[in-house]
Amino acid sequence: MHKLGMRNLLLLPLTLALAACAVGPDYRAPVLPESAALVRAESELVTAEAVERDFWRGFDDPLLTELVEEAFDANHDLRIALARHDRSLALLRQSRRDLAPSVTAQAGAAHQRVSSDQMPQATRSQRDYESYDAGIAALWELDFFGRVRRAVEAQQAEAEASAADLRAMQVVVVGELVEQYVRLRGLQEQLRVAQANADNQRESLALVDARLEAGRGTEFDSVRARAQLESTLARIPALEGEIAAITHRLAVLTGREPGALIARLEKPTPMPALHDQVAVGLPGELLRRRPDIAAAERRLHAATASIGVATADLYPRFTLNGLLGTQAASTGDLFGRDSETRLVALGVDWSFLDSGRVRARMAAADADAEANLARYEQTVLQALEEAETALARYTQSLREREHLEAAAEASAEAARQARVRFAVGVVDFLEVIDAERSRLEAEDGLAQSNVRAATALVGLYRALAGGWEERMEAPRQATAEPALSST
């Protein structure tokens, strides 16, 4: 009868466990908005085709591609994000272990001598006791109301959010690297323009000085020519300083010391070529592709599951304890048949007298979920805003560049004609100075416009989260183990 009662005691919680459900709300992902196209998508500049992978390869710059690959391998921000993702996966594995019994092995040996006051008639040897024991103990929380399962669900969502954070960091790092590289090439072009204009102005100064010596010029023209040359030369140190700073930044982005890339980057190369058309895809694809949206959605899932964890504390918590071992007064008898010990116990822990605290935790969890929902919705709107803004900036930068190209070409021709006309005495030197100043401003403006257009294109790809899909598969997956159901 005793054995039958114990068996029923054990079968009851096991039966309840099989029929258990997880309390708290079941998560349902918010529906993403579906738009036909981006508002700023002009047909001559963009297409609705899928965003290209590895967009930086489209610039046709082997050195840029090498630097991006090196950043993927060694960038410290990416290493930090990867370590955080590994940590979240470790916590997920730990939480999943809570679904199974916790089993420990234990052993001990003790020697005790009882006081002669307690046993006045016993000899010393009779007052000495030894005890030896060994066994295996198990503790299992019977998850009747889904507290453990909801905790695992929340941790899995957090792990998936950390994977999205890693992908977001890839977007940030590669986007910054490409932008800095484009700025470097633009600054080198500005430096070339300044040096070329300085050379032209030296020639003009030499011409003025020659006319002065021949008695056909004025000291005033010579002074103005020298002032213009010095003004142009003054631009060069600032440009060289910015070039050095960006070179150092690119080295750090690839995980190196600041001076490591000087030799590879000091030789100027043309600005990366811009695309005639950019594939931007559809807004719905953009929202599904953005890692920051994925991270926000996963954290909303985690916050929703945490409501279930808090709600489960309203109900009793059942634990099943078991012990199987041996205990004897000597090591020789430790594994004898009569030394066997066992224990099976069912425990109940119920904080119904403290329900006020539990309900306060539930309210806090619910508020946290509401905050995460608002954060998710805000992230979606920001993603659309960034894409629209980046597309508008790229479109306008191309139009600006078109006008500046024409201005630079015209100002170069005007400067050439002004020097010819001055040489034959048709105009005074003031016309030459004005023409050369206009040429410098136009060519420098064109170089800056090329940088703005290229960085706007990179910003567009960052907003679209394009070019990183293949890289996104590399991080360790939170779903390496089967997902848990919460029925």
Residue spans for each PLM region:
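A short glycine-centered flexible hinge/capping loop motif at secondary-structure junctions
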Residues: 212-216, 422-426, 463-467
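Short flexible linkers and secondary-structure junctions
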Residues: 22-176, 317-322, 341-343, 355-362
